């Protein structure tokens, strides 16, 4: 069944936001920020068995100025946090962040002064991917979920307000090291 059969009268109705979302999700260029063992699984995802290129991501960018997706794979030390933020700030809009692994998401088993307890304390995170380390299939699933999120993202002023709100929410979260609960 071709496109002609799906479109009544050959007319396609859509909005600019939906078309832009469709185009953006098919051409993500990730900037790798591999810091630990999760980076090995991220590299395996780019191999021939899992083939991330079928989602338009065949090129991992070494420079942040050409990337629009940052995959933070592994734990982030306190000394690496300013570098991570600088790389994020150098990325062009629109940009998205995927926290890959439990260490990037919440600090993992490294609950000490030297490790940031979650990348969301440094940059706003769009997708959290749990696991130690997460399998390549899980990374592909997270990328597909990010595609769904990109498809629904607003454009222009609405997007800028959504980004500011996400940044405020991320900065307002209580750091994990200060939380009280069963383990403290």
Swiss-Prot record:
Domain of life per record: Bacteria
EC numbers for this chain: 7.1.1.-
Reaction catalysis annotation: a quinone + NADH + 5 H(+)(in) = a quinol + NAD(+) + 4 H(+)(out)
A GO cellular component annotation in the UniProt record: plasma membrane
Keyword NAD applies: yes
Enzyme class: translocase
Role played: NDH-1 shuttles electrons from NADH, via FMN and iron-sulfur (Fe-S) centers, to quinones in the respiratory chain. The immediate electron acceptor for the enzyme in this species is believed to be a menaquinone. Couples the redox reaction to proton translocation (for every two electrons transferred, four hydrogen ions are translocated across the cytoplasmic membrane), and thus conserves the redox energy in a proton gradient.
Assigned protein family: Belongs to the complex I 20 kDa subunit family.
Protein name per its UniProtKB record: NADH-quinone oxidoreductase subunit B
